[in-house]
Amino acid sequence: MKTIASVTLPHHVHAPRYDRQQLQSRIVHFGFGAFHRAHQALLTDRVLNAQGGDWGICEISLFSGDQLMSQLRAQNHLYTVLEKGADGNQVIIVGAVNECLNAKLDSLAAIIEKFCEPQVAIVSLTITEKGYCIDPATGALDTSNPRIIHDLQTPEEPHSAPGILVEALKRRRERGLTPFTVLSCDNIPDNGHVVKNAVLGMAEKRSPELAGWIKEHVSFPGTMVDRIVPAATDESLAEISQHLGVNDPCAISCEPFIQWVVEDNFVAGRPAWEVAGVQMVNDVLPWEEMKLRMLNGSHSFLAYLGYLSGFAHISDCMQDRAFRHAARTLMLDEQAPTLQIKDVDLTQYAYKLIARFANPALKHKTWQIAMDGSQKLPQRMLAGIRIHLGRETDWSLLALGVAGWMRYVSGVDDAGNAIDVRDPLSDKIRDLVAGSSSEQRVTALLSLREVFGDDLPDNPHFVQAIEQAWQQIAQFGAHQALLNTLKI
């Protein structure tokens, strides 16, 4: 079978310019998803193209992804990234991945031993919020999670990311090997502390002495990641095949823009990512808050209200005058004033975001962005709302966004079509929706303390604003509610 590894590729395709035989698995990565392929792995590939070296990546997937891993192996661990801009495309073959392991194809034991190899310096992760097994209400390890329960009972055969990391670090310590840096690359707030809490929480349950050693010798840098990477579709894969002249089932499409801000705190070395444009900084938090509120908050706003209004893609929303105006107003009038970042022109940042959202070459589905809203809402919208409540400033679009989420998870769009709601709390949400009338819906969903905390449901100003926004959507539909809120 012909693959990108076995054919002569067209001249316009950018192939690796370095010696891949020199690569070692110095980075082990959890989660060979679309975002990682178009972001961290691609940036590492850029470093290798610039200066060579041995910073290869071993990709790990546990209980899914076996078909993707088999396909990756069949093409010598190469895959394609298509960067789609409004002005043209770039086709890139990424060669930074030199190995992959999967629990079904290989074994859990082989995966854990991979973490224990002497050359491993960084373990990076893109496993989504759910993968860290953290209780969102406390920020601590969720000891009621079935995988955590399993790992505490059988610690040498762990099934969770925290369990595997702790077991690997335990073995490295026993063998006299240096520890590795644990690098979360997930788009969640304070991701370095999230993974640190998960790992130390698991280690404390197993051995306080081990937890102390990890705390002293392992680093957990924070990161801010940014690139719009839609999930692969048959259509996007077919388009990439036309560029290549051969199929690549591991290929992914994305926008041209890319940003990675990384706390420069590594215990065993790192690639020279700054060569690829990565910003190595002392404190990631201001960058993270800017991105989560202005980009991700607006993305979620467009996803919920856009889906309800019948728009399938973010770029479709941006063709609509009201949605485009709302996105800009939300960013600059409601989200930007809540930030504390220096030396960044937030107006310019907002206009760049508008242009990225409007990119017609990207088909980023509103339904995809709307997934897992119960875990995204707190940092994307509610954090800014809390600041506005303290200042008594206007946050009417944020209120409409929260009400839009409530309407979306109620399971029916404005045309009366059923919505396939994907959320970690979907069972709980479904029960609350089924047990409440439209008039009671806001009160019912505000009982989700893991989303709204204890403070917001008890704040009469917050409750009143969300109820008013809900009534607007319920009475007029999402699009007209948006026009009413904007007064246009």
Question: Where in the sequence are the language-model features?
Answer:
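Substrate/ligand-engaging "lid" and interaction regions
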Residues: 1-488
